[in-house]
Amino acid sequence: MFITKCSLHLKSFDLDVLKDSCALILKNKINLQNLKLTGPINLPTKIKKITVLRSPHIDKKSREQFEIRTYTKTIQIESLTKNTNDIINFMKQFENSFFFGLNIKVVFTYKKDVLL
């Protein structure tokens, strides 16, 4: 059983943090030759709107709206060989990197050879 693909799903409220982290990941790819990087792929921005009353007692018509935007990108890393250490070594480079304000979800895809 070996890792064939790794998907990084990146989410942030701040678009600049998201762009900087994607640039850092793409910059570190230069060291490894056996990996194919696809992305960053922009996913739809989720907008959550919250409406509140301006005054606590009267004037129901007077309201204020706030919104929270969640930006999402994904990067896919594929291994060109059956060596699983390439993807793991690539991911260990970011183990000590701190991305403040960034949510990272890592999904690994495995493949198993069947001998008949």
From Swiss-Prot:
Short name of one Pfam family: Ribosomal_S10
Q: Name one GO biological process term.
A: translation
Query: In which compartments does the protein localize?
Result: Mitochondrion
Q: Which UniProt keywords apply?
A: Mitochondrion, Ribonucleoprotein, Ribosomal protein
The keyword Transmembrane helix belongs to this UniProt entry's keyword annotation: no
Highest taxon listed in the record's lineage = Eukaryota
Q: Which GO terms describe its cellular component?
A: mitochondrion; ribonucleoprotein complex; ribosome
Signal peptide location in the record?
Answer: none
Query: What are the GO MF terms of this UniProt record?
Result: structural constituent of ribosome
Q: Does the keyword Ribonucleoprotein apply?
A: yes
Main subcellular location = mitochondrion
Provide the family line: Belongs to the universal ribosomal protein uS10 family.
Task: Provide the protein name.
Answer: Small ribosomal subunit protein uS10m
The lineage is: Eukaryota, Discoba, Jakobida, Histionina, Histionidae
